[in-house]
Protein backbone atom coordinates (compact mmCIF):
# COMPACT_ATOMS: atom_id res chain seq x y z
CA UNK A 1 0.00 0.00 0.00
CA UNK A 2 2.59 2.50 -1.22
CA UNK A 3 0.23 5.53 -1.38
CA UNK A 4 -1.04 5.32 2.20
CA UNK A 5 -4.53 4.60 0.85
CA UNK A 6 -6.73 1.77 2.04
CA UNK A 7 -9.97 0.64 0.46
CA UNK A 8 -12.23 -1.86 2.09
CA UNK A 9 -14.95 -3.27 -0.15
CA UNK A 10 -17.10 -6.26 0.57
CA UNK A 11 -20.58 -7.67 0.15
CA UNK A 12 -22.63 -8.68 3.16
CA UNK A 13 -23.30 -12.27 3.98
CA UNK A 14 -26.79 -13.44 4.88
CA UNK A 15 -26.23 -12.77 8.56
CA UNK A 16 -25.79 -9.05 7.88
CA UNK A 17 -28.97 -8.61 5.85
CA UNK A 18 -30.90 -6.47 8.26
CA UNK A 19 -30.97 -3.29 6.25
CA UNK A 20 -34.42 -3.72 4.78
CA UNK A 21 -37.42 -5.94 4.49
CA UNK A 22 -35.93 -7.95 1.64
CA UNK A 23 -36.82 -8.08 -2.04
CA UNK A 24 -38.99 -11.19 -1.62
CA UNK A 25 -41.56 -9.48 0.59
CA UNK A 26 -41.70 -6.44 -1.71
CA UNK A 27 -42.21 -8.69 -4.75
CA UNK A 28 -45.11 -10.45 -3.03
CA UNK A 29 -46.68 -7.11 -2.12
CA UNK A 30 -46.42 -5.90 -5.74
CA UNK A 31 -47.82 -9.15 -7.19
CA UNK A 32 -50.81 -9.14 -4.82
CA UNK A 33 -51.55 -5.50 -5.69
CA UNK A 34 -51.20 -6.14 -9.43
CA UNK A 35 -53.55 -9.13 -9.42
CA UNK A 36 -56.18 -7.20 -7.45
CA UNK A 37 -55.91 -4.16 -9.72
CA UNK A 38 -56.29 -6.14 -12.94
CA UNK A 39 -59.48 -7.85 -11.79
CA UNK A 40 -60.87 -4.59 -10.45
CA UNK A 41 -60.02 -2.70 -13.66
CA UNK A 42 -61.95 -5.15 -15.84
CA UNK A 43 -64.97 -5.05 -13.55
CA UNK A 44 -64.98 -1.25 -13.40
CA UNK A 45 -64.71 -0.98 -17.19
CA UNK A 46 -67.80 -3.18 -17.62
CA UNK A 47 -69.72 -1.22 -14.98
CA UNK A 48 -68.69 2.09 -16.53
CA UNK A 49 -69.81 0.99 -19.98
CA UNK A 50 -73.17 -0.21 -18.67
CA UNK A 51 -73.90 2.80 -16.45
CA UNK A 52 -72.30 5.46 -18.65
CA UNK A 53 -70.64 6.89 -15.54
CA UNK A 54 -67.62 9.11 -16.11
CA UNK A 55 -66.42 8.44 -12.57
CA UNK A 56 -66.58 4.67 -13.09
CA UNK A 57 -64.64 4.92 -16.35
CA UNK A 58 -62.09 7.09 -14.55
CA UNK A 59 -61.80 4.45 -11.85
CA UNK A 60 -61.31 1.80 -14.56
CA UNK A 61 -58.49 3.89 -16.05
CA UNK A 62 -57.11 4.32 -12.53
CA UNK A 63 -56.99 0.55 -11.96
CA UNK A 64 -55.54 -0.19 -15.41
CA UNK A 65 -52.83 2.41 -14.77
CA UNK A 66 -52.14 0.81 -11.39
CA UNK A 67 -51.83 -2.60 -13.07
CA UNK A 68 -49.26 -1.25 -15.53
CA UNK A 69 -47.49 0.36 -12.58
CA UNK A 70 -47.29 -2.97 -10.73
CA UNK A 71 -45.82 -4.66 -13.83
CA UNK A 72 -43.13 -1.98 -14.05
CA UNK A 73 -42.44 -2.23 -10.31
CA UNK A 74 -42.11 -6.01 -10.65
CA UNK A 75 -39.55 -5.48 -13.41
CA UNK A 76 -37.73 -2.95 -11.22
CA UNK A 77 -37.42 -5.43 -8.35
CA UNK A 78 -36.23 -8.27 -10.56
CA UNK A 79 -33.74 -6.37 -12.73
CA UNK A 80 -32.18 -4.45 -9.86
CA UNK A 81 -30.98 -7.67 -8.21
CA UNK A 82 -28.68 -8.64 -11.09
CA UNK A 83 -25.08 -9.02 -9.90
CA UNK A 84 -22.36 -6.50 -10.63
CA UNK A 85 -20.36 -6.94 -13.82
CA UNK A 86 -17.46 -5.26 -15.61
CA UNK A 87 -19.72 -2.59 -17.12
CA UNK A 88 -21.61 -1.98 -13.86
CA UNK A 89 -19.11 -2.58 -11.04
CA UNK A 90 -21.48 -1.21 -8.39
CA UNK A 91 -24.34 -3.43 -9.53
CA UNK A 92 -27.75 -2.62 -10.97
CA UNK A 93 -29.48 -1.49 -7.78
CA UNK A 94 -30.50 1.92 -9.09
CA UNK A 95 -32.29 0.38 -12.07
CA UNK A 96 -35.24 -0.20 -9.75
CA UNK A 97 -35.68 3.57 -9.57
CA UNK A 98 -35.67 3.94 -13.35
CA UNK A 99 -38.55 1.48 -13.76
CA UNK A 100 -40.35 2.96 -10.77
CA UNK A 101 -40.01 6.43 -12.34
CA UNK A 102 -41.60 5.09 -15.52
CA UNK A 103 -44.36 3.62 -13.36
CA UNK A 104 -45.14 7.08 -11.99
CA UNK A 105 -45.48 8.35 -15.57
CA UNK A 106 -47.94 5.51 -16.26
CA UNK A 107 -50.00 6.61 -13.27
CA UNK A 108 -50.03 10.21 -14.51
CA UNK A 109 -50.78 9.56 -18.18
CA UNK A 110 -52.96 6.47 -17.92
CA UNK A 111 -54.85 7.53 -14.82
CA UNK A 112 -54.72 11.25 -14.09
CA UNK A 113 -54.87 12.65 -17.62
CA UNK A 114 -57.67 10.32 -18.72
CA UNK A 115 -59.73 10.96 -15.58
CA UNK A 116 -59.46 14.74 -15.79
CA UNK A 117 -60.20 14.74 -19.53
CA UNK A 118 -63.25 12.50 -19.12
CA UNK A 119 -64.48 14.52 -16.15
CA UNK A 120 -64.14 17.85 -17.94
CA UNK A 121 -65.95 16.40 -20.96
CA UNK A 122 -68.83 15.35 -18.71
CA UNK A 123 -68.95 18.75 -17.00
CA UNK A 124 -69.11 20.51 -20.37
CA UNK A 125 -71.39 18.23 -22.37
CA UNK A 126 -73.16 16.09 -19.78
CA UNK A 127 -73.76 12.36 -20.10
CA UNK A 128 -76.60 9.87 -20.22
CA UNK A 129 -76.55 7.75 -17.10
CA UNK A 130 -77.80 4.19 -17.11
CA UNK A 131 -78.62 2.02 -14.12
CA UNK A 132 -75.99 2.49 -11.39
CA UNK A 133 -76.82 -0.80 -9.63
CA UNK A 134 -73.93 -2.72 -11.20
CA UNK A 135 -71.56 0.15 -10.51
CA UNK A 136 -72.46 0.14 -6.81
CA UNK A 137 -71.84 -3.60 -6.65
CA UNK A 138 -68.47 -3.31 -8.40
CA UNK A 139 -67.44 -0.43 -6.15
CA UNK A 140 -68.24 -2.51 -3.06
CA UNK A 141 -66.28 -5.52 -4.32
CA UNK A 142 -63.38 -3.29 -5.40
CA UNK A 143 -63.30 -1.67 -1.96
CA UNK A 144 -62.92 -5.09 -0.34
CA UNK A 145 -60.16 -6.19 -2.74
CA UNK A 146 -58.25 -2.92 -2.44
CA UNK A 147 -58.50 -3.20 1.34
CA UNK A 148 -56.98 -6.69 1.18
CA UNK A 149 -54.10 -5.41 -0.94
CA UNK A 150 -53.56 -2.40 1.34
CA UNK A 151 -53.61 -4.56 4.47
CA UNK A 152 -50.79 -6.66 3.03
CA UNK A 153 -48.73 -3.52 2.42
CA UNK A 154 -49.51 -2.11 5.86
CA UNK A 155 -48.30 -5.33 7.50
CA UNK A 156 -44.97 -4.99 5.70
CA UNK A 157 -44.72 -1.32 6.64
CA UNK A 158 -45.45 -2.05 10.30
CA UNK A 159 -42.75 -4.69 10.37
CA UNK A 160 -40.21 -2.24 8.96
CA UNK A 161 -41.19 0.68 11.18
CA UNK A 162 -41.08 -1.55 14.25
CA UNK A 163 -37.66 -2.92 13.32
CA UNK A 164 -36.24 0.53 12.59
CA UNK A 165 -38.05 2.21 15.52
CA UNK A 166 -39.40 5.03 13.34
CA UNK A 167 -42.87 6.38 12.66
CA UNK A 168 -44.82 5.29 9.60
CA UNK A 169 -44.72 8.83 8.22
CA UNK A 170 -40.94 9.07 8.60
CA UNK A 171 -40.44 5.67 7.01
CA UNK A 172 -42.61 6.50 3.98
CA UNK A 173 -40.92 9.88 3.58
CA UNK A 174 -37.35 8.52 3.65
CA UNK A 175 -37.53 4.88 2.55
CA UNK A 176 -35.53 3.84 -0.49
CA UNK A 177 -37.93 0.92 -1.07
CA UNK A 178 -40.11 2.94 -3.44
CA UNK A 179 -41.95 -0.16 -4.69
CA UNK A 180 -43.64 -0.63 -1.33
CA UNK A 181 -44.24 3.11 -1.05
CA UNK A 182 -45.85 3.10 -4.51
CA UNK A 183 -48.18 0.22 -3.64
CA UNK A 184 -49.17 1.90 -0.36
CA UNK A 185 -49.94 5.25 -2.00
CA UNK A 186 -51.76 3.68 -4.94
CA UNK A 187 -53.91 1.42 -2.77
CA UNK A 188 -54.72 4.31 -0.44
CA UNK A 189 -55.57 6.51 -3.43
CA UNK A 190 -57.68 3.69 -4.85
CA UNK A 191 -59.83 3.55 -1.71
CA UNK A 192 -60.28 7.33 -1.75
CA UNK A 193 -61.06 7.15 -5.47
CA UNK A 194 -63.73 4.52 -4.87
CA UNK A 195 -65.39 6.77 -2.30
CA UNK A 196 -65.26 9.69 -4.75
CA UNK A 197 -66.77 7.54 -7.51
CA UNK A 198 -69.52 6.39 -5.14
CA UNK A 199 -70.26 9.98 -4.18
CA UNK A 200 -70.36 11.04 -7.82
CA UNK A 201 -72.71 8.22 -8.78
CA UNK A 202 -74.99 8.83 -5.81
CA UNK A 203 -75.09 12.59 -6.39
CA UNK A 204 -75.94 12.12 -10.08
CA UNK A 205 -78.61 9.54 -9.23
CA UNK A 206 -80.30 11.66 -6.57
CA UNK A 207 -80.22 14.95 -8.47
CA UNK A 208 -80.30 13.73 -12.06
CA UNK A 209 -77.38 16.09 -12.73
CA UNK A 210 -74.23 14.47 -14.25
CA UNK A 211 -72.17 17.36 -12.83
CA UNK A 212 -71.55 15.29 -9.69
CA UNK A 213 -70.21 12.39 -11.73
CA UNK A 214 -67.93 14.65 -13.77
CA UNK A 215 -66.67 16.42 -10.65
CA UNK A 216 -65.83 13.06 -9.05
CA UNK A 217 -63.87 12.10 -12.16
CA UNK A 218 -61.84 15.34 -12.04
CA UNK A 219 -61.09 14.83 -8.34
CA UNK A 220 -59.94 11.26 -9.01
CA UNK A 221 -57.61 12.61 -11.70
CA UNK A 222 -56.21 15.23 -9.34
CA UNK A 223 -55.59 12.55 -6.71
CA UNK A 224 -53.71 10.39 -9.21
CA UNK A 225 -51.66 13.37 -10.38
CA UNK A 226 -50.55 13.97 -6.78
CA UNK A 227 -49.56 10.31 -6.32
CA UNK A 228 -47.63 10.37 -9.60
CA UNK A 229 -45.81 13.56 -8.55
CA UNK A 230 -44.75 12.17 -5.16
CA UNK A 231 -43.46 8.92 -6.67
CA UNK A 232 -41.69 10.67 -9.56
CA UNK A 233 -39.97 13.09 -7.17
CA UNK A 234 -38.72 10.34 -4.85
CA UNK A 235 -37.55 8.01 -7.60
CA UNK A 236 -35.78 10.82 -9.47
CA UNK A 237 -33.96 11.76 -6.26
CA UNK A 238 -32.80 8.17 -5.70
CA UNK A 239 -31.90 7.69 -9.35
CA UNK A 240 -29.66 10.77 -9.26
CA UNK A 241 -28.10 9.56 -6.02
CA UNK A 242 -29.32 10.22 -2.50
CA UNK A 243 -27.43 10.04 0.78
CA UNK A 244 -28.47 8.14 3.87
CA UNK A 245 -30.67 9.95 6.40
CA UNK A 246 -28.73 12.23 8.76
CA UNK A 247 -29.31 9.84 11.66
CA UNK A 248 -27.56 6.99 9.84
CA UNK A 249 -24.70 9.25 8.73
CA UNK A 250 -24.21 10.35 12.33
CA UNK A 251 -24.17 6.70 13.41
CA UNK A 252 -21.46 5.93 10.84
CA UNK A 253 -19.38 8.96 11.85
CA UNK A 254 -19.70 8.13 15.55
CA UNK A 255 -18.79 4.50 14.88
CA UNK A 256 -15.65 5.47 12.97
CA UNK A 257 -14.62 8.04 15.56
CA UNK A 258 -15.01 5.40 18.27
CA UNK A 259 -12.42 3.10 16.69
CA UNK A 260 -9.20 2.91 18.74
CA UNK A 261 -6.91 3.81 15.83
CA UNK A 262 -9.08 6.60 14.40
CA UNK A 263 -8.39 10.19 15.40
CA UNK A 264 -11.41 11.63 13.58
CA UNK A 265 -13.46 11.50 10.39
CA UNK A 266 -12.51 14.34 8.07
CA UNK A 267 -15.16 13.77 5.39
CA UNK A 268 -18.02 11.32 4.85
CA UNK A 269 -20.07 10.55 1.74
CA UNK A 270 -22.90 8.01 1.52
CA UNK A 271 -24.88 6.97 -1.55
CA UNK A 272 -28.00 4.78 -1.70
CA UNK A 273 -28.15 2.21 -4.51
CA UNK A 274 -31.10 0.28 -3.09
CA UNK A 275 -32.93 -0.50 0.18
CA UNK A 276 -30.14 -2.90 1.15
CA UNK A 277 -27.30 -1.45 -0.91
CA UNK A 278 -25.45 1.60 0.42
CA UNK A 279 -21.95 2.83 -0.37
CA UNK A 280 -19.87 4.65 2.25
CA UNK A 281 -16.69 6.61 1.46
CA UNK A 282 -14.75 8.52 4.09
CA UNK A 283 -11.51 10.40 4.60
CA UNK A 284 -10.21 9.31 7.99
CA UNK A 285 -7.36 10.61 10.10
CA UNK A 286 -5.78 7.50 11.60
CA UNK A 287 -3.33 7.55 14.48
CA UNK A 288 0.27 7.29 13.28
CA UNK A 289 0.76 3.72 12.09
CA UNK A 290 4.17 2.44 11.12
CA UNK A 291 3.36 -0.20 8.51
CA UNK A 292 0.96 -0.79 5.65
CA UNK A 293 -0.26 -3.92 7.43
CA UNK A 294 -1.32 -1.84 10.43
CA UNK A 295 -3.23 0.56 8.17
CA UNK A 296 -4.98 -2.36 6.47
CA UNK A 297 -5.94 -3.87 9.83
CA UNK A 298 -7.29 -0.54 11.08
CA UNK A 299 -9.37 -0.06 7.92
CA UNK A 300 -10.74 -3.60 8.11
CA UNK A 301 -11.72 -3.17 11.75
CA UNK A 302 -13.42 0.16 11.02
CA UNK A 303 -15.30 -1.29 8.05
CA UNK A 304 -16.69 -4.16 10.09
CA UNK A 305 -17.83 -1.76 12.78
CA UNK A 306 -19.64 0.43 10.22
CA UNK A 307 -21.47 -2.55 8.75
CA UNK A 308 -22.58 -3.66 12.19
CA UNK A 309 -23.85 -0.16 13.00
CA UNK A 310 -25.75 0.27 9.70
CA UNK A 311 -26.42 -3.18 8.17
CA UNK A 312 -27.67 -1.72 4.87
CA UNK A 313 -24.08 -0.70 4.04
CA UNK A 314 -22.57 -3.02 1.42
CA UNK A 315 -19.39 -1.16 0.45
CA UNK A 316 -17.00 0.85 2.59
CA UNK A 317 -14.09 2.84 1.16
CA UNK A 318 -11.75 4.44 3.69
CA UNK A 319 -9.03 6.88 2.69
CA UNK A 320 -6.34 7.41 5.37
CA UNK A 321 -5.80 11.17 5.19
CA UNK A 322 -3.67 13.41 7.41
CA UNK A 323 -5.45 16.47 8.81
CA UNK A 324 -4.91 19.70 6.94
CA UNK A 325 -3.04 22.40 8.87
Where are these regions (language model features)?
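Aspartate-rich (DDxxD/NDxxD/DxxxD) Mg2+/diphosphate-binding motifs
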Residues: 76-95, 125
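Residues that define the loop-to-transmembrane-helix transition and helix capping
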Residues: 27, 53-56, 210-214
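Topogenic membrane-insertion module of multi-pass membrane proteins
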Residues: 1-42
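Acidic (Asp/Glu-rich) catalytic motifs at the cytosolic membrane interface
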Residues: 49-82, 116, 120, 181-195
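Alpha-helical transmembrane segments of integral membrane proteins, especially early/N-terminal helices
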Residues: 23-32, 61-71, 98-110
